[in-house]
Amino acid sequence: MPQKYFGTDGIRGKANVFPMTPDFAMKVGMAVGILFRSQNQSRRVVIGKDTRLSGYMLENALVSGFTAAGMEAFLLGPVPTPAVAMLCRSLRADLGVMISASHNPFYDNGIKLFGPDGFKLSDEIEEKIEQLIDTDLSKSLASCAEIGYAKRVEGDIYRYIEYAKRTLPRDVRLDNLRIVVDCANGAAYKAAPRALWELGAEVFAINDTPNGTNINHKCGSTDLASLKQKVHEVRADVGIALDGDGDRVLLVDEKAQTVDGDQLIAVIAEHWHKNGRLQSKGVVTTIMSNLGLERFLNSKGLDLVRTKVGDRYVVDAMRKKGYNVGGEASGHIVLSDFGTTGDGLVAALQILACMQEIQIPMSHLCQRFEPVPQIFKNVMIKNKNVLKKNPVKTAIEQATQRLGKKARLVIRASGTEPVIRIMGEGDEREMLDAVVTEMVDIITHHDTLSKACASLERS
């Protein structure tokens, strides 16, 4: 059943436009606080945020809601999303909240929720929260004597830095490595350069001066141009690109070539398998991961399990099936030996440690397989149910049959935008082009019909 407010990664939208308004954020805080207060003892919530201007507004609104429900709010300030998950466990909180829209522009924002174990909340709990939001919450708020309070937590970012460093053996240092790190003017602008420097690297930090509106703007994991330029300029061994909330990472090698999440997963999986650390003889990725990764892993005797798009689904599959490596091509890398969610800094450290151990350039280390050609198209839509229409479903089935087993067609609705995402993948480029173009035309046509029918109904 589709959820009313929650998408694939929490509640998200444009700041000061529903649902990212202060009054709705306060209601979310009340509903979540009431639910968790009734189930747990500590009544403690930790709240982090990235560097968006609207983070202050939403933070205060959430604090009002949580304290009205009787929760104690511990405010972390700007920290990466994985730091919230880690500190939720470390501070013995009932709940963790991250105010962020990840890789989106500054004018968007979102609310991500974590349970006391550091994992994102299940669909079932999110549904309960939605039901509470739509009720009269005033009758369930705390009494005057039980109203909660808020306090700033000092030194939390240094706890996260130490946590990230401890994912490497004590004898691993990054001496003699020249590293450029693009902080995306986001939540990791302090932690990432500091951790790399403390491990011995020569660090060049760029896009590390957030001003509230420059997060993810022509920088970070969604725009590698400035990172590639800096890597070339200072002759760096590697460039690291984080996103706005620090939960995803892409790399750039010494030749300024992009290394995506699939290649990072391949490196970690192969290295850990050789060292006996890889669990369940495989990894978990999504339907968007490249077929080349699957072929590479299979050639090593390893499995690849695919899930829906979203790191929460990757994590769910990892927990259920016992895998300890998972992720997405976009750069969400989940290593469950260390954490409960994607962590860009920790993933980058594992690659750097591998590079130091093997003593080969990044360009040799991180090109583990030849990617199969992929074509991506986004179709803006008005009717989010257009994929459920029989003519569209039939066309997709027929196109999939035409492509056969050596190619893939993935068509899905975005969980955060009014967009249908189409991905065609296979060795025959001309056929892929034709099939993807056909799908764009069919979806656009039936979405237009939906709009025409809606106009007739209104008239």
Curated annotation (Swiss-Prot):
Instruction: Locate the Phosphoserine modifications and list their residues.
Output: 102
- GO MF annotations in UniProt: magnesium ion binding; phosphoglucosamine mutase activity; phosphomannomutase activity
Superkingdom classification of source = Bacteria
Write out the GO biological process terms: carbohydrate metabolic process; peptidoglycan biosynthetic process; UDP-N-acetylglucosamine biosynthetic process
- Any idea which residues are catalytic in this one? 102 (phosphoserine intermediate)
Protein modification:
Activated by phosphorylation.
Specify whether Metal-binding is a keyword of the entry.
yes
Tell me how the cofactor is bound: Binds 1 Mg(2+) ion per subunit.
Catalytic activity, EC = 5.4.2.10
GO (cellular component) term, any one: cytosol
Q: One Pfam family this chain carries?
A: PGM_PMM_I
- The UniProt annotation places Mg(2+) binding at 102, 243, 245, 247
As its record notes, the protein acts as a catalyst of: alpha-D-glucosamine 1-phosphate = D-glucosamine 6-phosphate
Q: What keywords were assigned to this record?
A: Isomerase, Magnesium, Metal-binding, Phosphoprotein
To which protein family does this belong? Answer: Belongs to the phosphohexose mutase family.
Q: What does the protein in this record do? A: Catalyzes the conversion of glucosamine-6-phosphate to glucosamine-1-phosphate.
Spell out the HAMAP family in the cross-references. Answer: GlmM_B (MF_01554_B)
Stated name of the protein: Phosphoglucosamine mutase
Q: What is the lineage of its organism?
A: Bacteria, Pseudomonadati, Pseudomonadota, Alphaproteobacteria, Hyphomicrobiales
